[in-house]
Amino acid sequence: MCFEELKRRLLEGIDLRQGRLHLAKVSQGRFLEEENYTIHLNGERLLFAKVFYGRKPYYKEWVELFNIEEGFFGTEAEDLLLELFSKCFRRLFVEYYNDLQTTKELKSGIPPQETRLGKKLKSLGYTYFKDWYYPEGWMEGGYKLQAERL
C-alpha cells in the first residue's frame, strides 16, 4: 500500500471505536508533488497533513501532521494514522504541542525516541529522531517531532 491506496482508504473512511475517520478535503500544495489533507473524525476536523510525494532523484517523500486536536493523542485514530502514513513515508513530522505527555517528557530532558510519541514511531521502524522545539523560520510551523528511517 502506498500513496494512492493510502489516499483511497482515507477518502472512503475508516470506522474506529471513536467514530469515522476520513479524508474530508484534498487541495494542491505549494509544489506539483505536494498536497494538503484535512482529516476529520466524526465530521469534525482532527488534523491537517502536508503530504510531499517526493521529487526523484533529488527529494524523498515526507508527511507532516499539524494543527492536531488534543483528543487525537493516545487514541486508536493516532495509532492507525501513524501506521498508515509510516507505510508510505520514510520521513514523518508530527506536531506535538497538544500532546501533553510528549511535551512534558521532552521538556524534562527525555530523548525524543523515548517519549510517548517517539516510542510509538520507533515501533513503526523509525530510527532517527529530532525535536524541532525551535523551528528555524516562519515556514516550519510549530513544535514537532521528526522521525526518519533509512
Summary of predicted features, one role per range:
Residues 72-80:
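A short glycine-leucine-enriched loop at secondary-structure breakpoints
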Residues 1-73, 87-150:
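Non-catalytic substrate-recognition and accessory regions of acyl/acetyltransferase enzymes
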